[in-house]
Amino acid sequence: MRKAVRRAAAALTAGVLIALGSSAPVLAQGAWEAPAAEKAKKNPAPADAATVAQGKKVAEVNCVSCHGAKGKGDGAAAVALNPKPADWTSKKVQSESDGEIFWKLSTGRGAMPSWKFLPENDRWALVRYIRTLAAK
């Protein structure tokens, strides 16, 4: 009898740990807020066609598989992701500061990788490109 109770308790404990472990990434998502100092950062990249073209190239090489060709979060890999990739054309993304977007793509979270290995000027150019996608 004791052996059966111990087995049941062990099975229940294992089940709870597995459930908590598999749901932890989802529970950890919550609001994704950049620190105030990061939100306040200004984009040093020029707001010109060359910078936007540079940012578009960065997106095509690194981001399209998840965010899609038009930045709507509908890339081929997005089907398997939860939460879904951000829609760069959305009011939510477009209302974020340049510093906040830069911080998010530099830091990453969950399925969103950190792009810190990309040169800083490429990441700022990507922010400039994302800005061109508003309401498209």
Residue ranges: model-predicted function:
Residues 36-42, 80-87:
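Short glycine/proline- and charge-enriched loop/turn segments
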Residues 58, 133-136:
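Short sequence/structural segments immediately N-terminal
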Residues 49-72, 78, 99-107:
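Sequence/structural segment immediately N-terminal to covalent heme-attachment motifs in c-type
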Residues 30-58:
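Electrostatic cytochrome c docking/interface patches
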Residues 11-21:
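Bacterial N-terminal signal peptides
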